């Protein structure tokens, strides 16, 4: 006789309830969080503007059906597109992530919480334009900053103790979950509707990390977050219609996320949701490089200057040794052919070789015309990594959150340079005072890529005046970015 199926519908999983209660009820009071969110907004938009320089990104942008213009549609920064919020979220999200130059969160799971700005900004602009058309008040940029802080917190707090990469899943699933929650709240959904929306995000089949690792590394890693944040807007809009949710999306035996995708394990949590993640997020300021390599690139730049002072060049190098942390080795320690820019910006040997050869590392250095220089692969072959357990421990320490790398150069004449150690990149919370002026410079450079001088100045006047920016309607701010 077969066992009967228990068809009593459970309460929503506690993990889902905690997310929803946080987005609905938690008041952000941290000045540091808002200060950081302000600069995060500017940096993230700037990253999107730089991506417009690359045809591989631009070809994916615009409406699904060419020529479609949506009434009261979202303005995509740096373009003339006017899109529905779902497709706009994809456009903005793909731009943001394309060059791997936006913010980073490193823990048991890695990720880029500002990826959520795709869904947040698209939803806020769409709501604002429709509100104005109906004679109602638009959303303000302060509401965008609040949504950013909360999306960062959801994605980052889940990532602290839970490794999705170890089960082959891509971190963009956390973008989908975080964006769904904050977008649903922005749309004015009820608590029950937001619970439904978040459960729908967990029930989705989640992206695999296939496209982030050899031998399949490819450009999907540059648009995967855009795909996730746009899916979030879609799910939130579905929930707004009254579409049902799935209370035990995580915990259902056999069919829930834990049993299907997480080896039967439940999530662990280090801290309740607050504003910790935005306060401690990492900015990529100096180099468009996968974050586990940022300090290695900084060390390589220092060594390049030392080589110049000593009258040496990369041709004189016999051996390069990188002392690093475990996550770096697992993600970007790569030998063999590199097939495309996405492959190259996830290879620490490539990202160290370029500054040792040329004294720079820019997004253009991942392109084919640079990579064909035979000296790069020759130097890559001389670069080896090994794990320092102390670096790994500091990486996981919540009070340190170091991303340390140390490089030693040995030369063909038998000499060597003293090891250069960099524990914290310039985008780290411990180096905010050094980093923020450079972050603003990065934003100015990216504005200059797309806009004439007068338009750049109009954007800067508002963007750098925090009080004025916070009060500005979202639609008016995005209008500044239309070409």
Curated annotation (Swiss-Prot):
Pathway: Organic acid metabolism; propanoate degradation; Carbohydrate metabolism; tricarboxylic acid cycle; isocitrate from oxaloacetate: step 2/2. It comes from Escherichia coli (strain K12). Pfam families: MmgE_PrpD_C (PF19305), MmgE_PrpD_N (PF03972). Coiled coil: none annotated. The keyword Transmembrane helix does not apply. Induction: By propionate, but not acetate or glucose. Expression of prpBCDE operon is regulated by PrpR, CRP and a variety of sugars such as arabinose, galactose, glucose mannose and xylose. PANTHER family: 2-METHYLCITRATE DEHYDRATASE (PTHR16943:SF8), 2-METHYLCITRATE DEHYDRATASE-RELATED (PTHR16943). This is 2-methylcitrate dehydratase.
């Amino acid at each position: 006789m077969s066992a009967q199926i228990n068809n009593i519908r459970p309460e929503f999983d506690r993990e889902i309830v905690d997310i929803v209660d946080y987005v609905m009820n938690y008041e952000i009071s941290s000045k540091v969080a808002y200060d950081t969110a302000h600069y995060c907004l500017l940096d993230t938009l700037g990253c999107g503007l730089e991506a417009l320089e690359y045809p591989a990104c631009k070809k994916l942008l615009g409406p699904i059906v060419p020529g479609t213009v949506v009434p009261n549609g979202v303005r995509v920064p740096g373009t003339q597109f006017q899109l529905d919020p779902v497709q706009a979220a994809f456009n903005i999200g793909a731009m943001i992530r394309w060059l791997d130059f936006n913010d980073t969160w490193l823990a048991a799971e890695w990720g880029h919480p500002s990826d959520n700005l795709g869904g947040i900004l698209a939803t806020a602009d769409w709501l604002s334009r429709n509100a104005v058309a109906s004679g109602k008040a638009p959303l303000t940029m302060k509401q965008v900053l609040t949504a950013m802080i909360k999306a960062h917190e959801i994605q980052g707090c889940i990532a602290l103790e839970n490794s999705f990469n170890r089960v082959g899943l891509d971190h963009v699933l956390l973008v989908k979950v975080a964006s769904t929650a904050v977008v649903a709240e922005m749309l004015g959904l009820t608590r029950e509707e937001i619970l439904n929306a978040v459960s729908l995000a967990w029930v989705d089949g989640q992206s695999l990390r296939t496209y982030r690792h050899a031998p399949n590394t490819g450009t999907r890693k540059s648009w995967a977050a855009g795909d996730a944040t746009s899916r979030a807007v879609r799910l939130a809009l579905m929930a707004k219609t009254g579409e049902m949710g799935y209370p035990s999306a995580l915990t259902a035996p056999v069919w829930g996320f834990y049993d299907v995708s997480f080896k039967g394990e439940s999530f662990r949590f280090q801290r309740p949701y607050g504003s910790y993640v935005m306060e401690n997020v990492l900015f990529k300021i100096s180099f468009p490089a996968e974050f586990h390599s940022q300090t290695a690139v900084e060390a390589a730049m220092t060594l390049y200057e030392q080589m110049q002072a000593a009258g040496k060049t990369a041709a004189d190098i016999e051996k390069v040794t990188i002392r690093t942390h475990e996550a770096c080795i697992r993600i970007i320690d790569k030998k063999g052919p590199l097939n495309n820019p996405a492959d190259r910006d996830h290879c620490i040997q490539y990202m160290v070789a370029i500054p040792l050869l040329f004294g720079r590392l820019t997004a253009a250095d991942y392109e084919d015309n640079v990579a064909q220089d035979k000296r790069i692969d020759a130097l890559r072959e001389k670069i080896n990594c090994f794990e320092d357990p102390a670096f790994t421990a500091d990486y996981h320490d919540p009070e340190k959150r170091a991303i340390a790398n140390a490089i030693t150069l040995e030369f063909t004449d038998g000499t060597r340079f003293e090891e250069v150690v960099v524990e914290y990149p310039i985008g780290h919370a411990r180096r905010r005072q050094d980093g923020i002026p450079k972050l603003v410079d990065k934003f100015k450079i990216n504005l200059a890529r797309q806009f004439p001088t007068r338009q750049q100045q109009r954007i800067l006047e508002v963007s750098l005046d925090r009080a004025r920016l916070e009060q500005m309607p979202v639609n008016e701010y995005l209008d500044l970015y239309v070409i």
